[in-house]
Amino acid sequence: MIGGLLSDLVVALPLLALLAVLADAIAAPRGCGVMGARTVYGLAVLLLAALLGFGVLLFLTGAPMVSAAGVAILAASLSLISNIKRKVLGEPLVFSDFALIGAVFRHPQFYLSAMRPWQVAVLAGGLGGLALTLVLLSNAWLAPRLAGVAFSFGAWAGLTLSLARIRRTGFAIVPDPEADVARLGLVPCLLAQWHIWRASVDPLPCDAEPIAGLSGQLVVIVQCE
């Protein structure tokens, strides 16, 4: 069993890295390096994030190849969703967009109207196929699950150090999602935004005196996304 697991990992881990890089390359805007490459820090965070996802799925399924494919499908789906948002609203995904996940299910027609039929089919088919594959190809072996735990903890430790290093470079002091994604990549950019948000201090509450409005006063609020 151990020998079979090692042989599977020898194939699955390089495949995981390749698919993660290809999935990130789909996300617009492209990188500024040679052939659209991201920075070294962005690549490191991407591979560590892929390894973390791989470890979690390996713990859940016990199947290395399925776990690698699952991470690739999720990363490619994020890139596709980000490209659609960028086409409609002019910017790629940002960390705060995940607060709107509930709105996607409450008002799906708003988001589906921005997608072409083939994009809906690819996204639904990919996520549905991933769920079905995870159910059908999972096994009860203990060794892969222990390996998944080890990969997850190792990747989490590496991500913590890498994201702290990115924060110290002054990342996102002035928000610029286009430039940030071009430099780091989509998933590294989302994780860096989350890390900076976690480290930020909440502002003090406003202590200004309330302004008394006129009776029957009309207030118009316009929200733009």
Mark where each language-model region is.
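Transmembrane and membrane-interface helices of multi-pass
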Residues: 1-176
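Soluble catalytic regions of membrane-associated enzymes that act on cell-envelope
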Residues: 168-224
